Curated annotation (Swiss-Prot):
Quaternary structure note: Component of the ATP synthase complex composed at least of ATP5F1A/subunit alpha, ATP5F1B/subunit beta, ATP5MC1/subunit c (homooctomer), MT-ATP6/subunit a, MT-ATP8/subunit 8, ATP5ME/subunit e, ATP5MF/subunit f, ATP5MG/subunit g, ATP5MK/subunit k, ATP5MJ/subunit j, ATP5F1C/subunit gamma, ATP5F1D/subunit delta, ATP5F1E/subunit epsilon, ATP5PF/subunit F6, ATP5PB/subunit b, ATP5PD/subunit d, ATP5PO/subunit OSCP.
Keyword annotations from UniProtKB, A to Z: Acetylation, ATP synthesis, CF(1), Hydrogen ion transport, Ion transport, Membrane, Mitochondrion, Mitochondrion inner membrane, Transport
Family label: Belongs to the eukaryotic ATPase epsilon family.
Modified residues (N6-succinyllysine): K21, K32, K37
Organism: Bos taurus (Bovine)
The protein's name: ATP synthase F(1) complex subunit epsilon, mitochondrial
Protein role: Subunit epsilon, of the mitochondrial membrane ATP synthase complex (F(1)F(0) ATP synthase or Complex V) that produces ATP from ADP in the presence of a proton gradient across the membrane which is generated by electron transport complexes of the respiratory chain. ATP synthase complex consist of a soluble F(1) head domain - the catalytic core - and a membrane F(1) domain - the membrane proton channel. These two domains are linked by a central stalk rotating inside the F(1) region and a stationary peripheral stalk.
Modified residues (N6-acetyllysine): K21, K32, K37, K44
GO CC terms: mitochondrial inner membrane; mitochondrion; proton-transporting ATP synthase complex
GO aspect biological process, one term: proton motive force-driven mitochondrial ATP synthesis
Gene3D superfamilies per the UniProt record, alphabetical: ATP synthase, F1 complex, epsilon subunit superfamily, mitochondrial (1.10.1620.20)
InterPro entries named in the record: ATP_synth_F1_esu_mt (IPR006721), ATP_synth_F1_esu_sf_mt (IPR036742)
GO molecular function list: proton-transporting ATP synthase activity, rotational mechanism
Record lineage: Eukaryota, Metazoa, Chordata, Craniata, Vertebrata
Length: 51
């Protein structure tokens, strides 16, 4: 059985982004501000020192 998102021609990452946006849009206004604040992604890059 093929997943529905695969049948629609989506990658899993794109599918999860669409689902997350739908959930954030459905939230009540009192919870929406916190959800929008945490919806961004954070990446930390660390360079390894060679000794």
């Amino acid at each position: 059985m093929v997943a529905y998102w695969r049948q629609a021609g989506l990658s899993y990452i794109r599918y999860s982004q669409i689902c997350a946006k739908a959930v954030r849009d459905a939230l009540k206004t009192e919870f929406k501000a916190n959800a929008m604040k945490t919806s961004g992604s954070t990446i930390k890059i660390v360079k390894v020192k060679k000794e």
